[in-house]
């Protein structure tokens, strides 16, 4: 049996997810070019809320207040927003109604500047080069990456305002953004770590 994942722990690219949630809202049905029906539902657990995209007849059975277990689901970005999907072998099983502790905030499906920057970096890297090694090297000097690094290490007044608007995302984002800076010892021109440049200036 797969261990259950909390909504706060869902990240883009994760697969084989098992998530227990309550349905808060069911969105309207949209039709794809292929004739499939897609419904986006807002769901939550005690750690926050997220959108789930439900395809075809499964969407007709989901009602607000349903407590559902997603099995073999996956997470991906849709228009820069984190979204859960059922996947090919995925399953939604109703296990109850109404009685579940949940929190609507933070909403992990709100547009996250960190995810948008990652998407633009990967698209820019794919346009510049098709290889994975050049992809990593070419994405670091891109303007979106420097904006993220400035919010992490410099004393500029602009980026901290963005961090305060989404405290749940910035706390986790701050950790992930600082890790690549420490793994690039040969990049002294980056603005990522102001402490190192101050130490070398005093010596």
From Swiss-Prot:
Composition bias type Low complexity, residue spans: 118-140
Chief location bin: nucleus
Keywords in alphabetical order: DNA damage, DNA repair, DNA-binding, Nucleus
CDD domains per record: SoSSB_OBF
GO molecular function: DNA binding; single-stranded DNA binding
Superkingdom per UniProt: Eukaryota
DNA-binding region of this protein: 22-92
GO CC annotation terms, alphabetical: nucleus; SOSS complex
Region (Disordered): 110-203
Functional description taken from the UniProt entry: Component of the SOSS complex, a multiprotein complex that functions downstream of the MRN complex to promote DNA repair and G2/M checkpoint. In the SOSS complex, acts as a sensor of single-stranded DNA that binds to single-stranded DNA. The SOSS complex associates with DNA lesions and influences diverse endpoints in the cellular DNA damage response including cell-cycle checkpoint activation, recombinational repair and maintenance of genomic stability. Required for efficient homologous recombination-dependent repair of double-strand breaks (DSBs).
Protein name as annotated: SOSS complex subunit B1-A
């Amino acid at each position: 049996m797969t261990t259950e994942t909390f909504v706060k722990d869902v990240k883009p690219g994760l697969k084989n997810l098992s998530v227990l949630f309550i349905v808060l809202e069911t969105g309207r049905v949209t039709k794809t070019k292929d004739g499939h029906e897609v419904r986006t539902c807002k769901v939550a657990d005690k750690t926050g809320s997220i959108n789930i995209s439900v395809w075809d007849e499964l969407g007709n059975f989901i009602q607000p207040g349903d407590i559902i277990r997603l099995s073999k689901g996956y997470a991906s970005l849709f228009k820069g927003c984190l979204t859960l999907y059922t996947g090919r072998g995925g399953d939604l099983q109703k296990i109850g109604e109404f009685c579940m502790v949940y929190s609507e905030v933070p909403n992990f499906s709100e547009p996250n500047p960190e995810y948008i920057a990652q998407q633009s970096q990967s698209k820019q890297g794919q346009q510049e080069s098709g290889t994975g090694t050049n992809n990593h090297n070419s994405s670091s000097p891109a303007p979106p990456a420097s904006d993220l690094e400035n919010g992490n290490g410099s004393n500029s007044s602009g980026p901290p305002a963005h961090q305060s608007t989404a405290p749940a995302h910035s706390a986790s984002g701050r950790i992930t953004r600082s890790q690549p800076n420490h793994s690039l010892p040969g990049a002294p021109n980056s603005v990522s770590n102001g402490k190192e440049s101050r130490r070398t200036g005093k010596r």
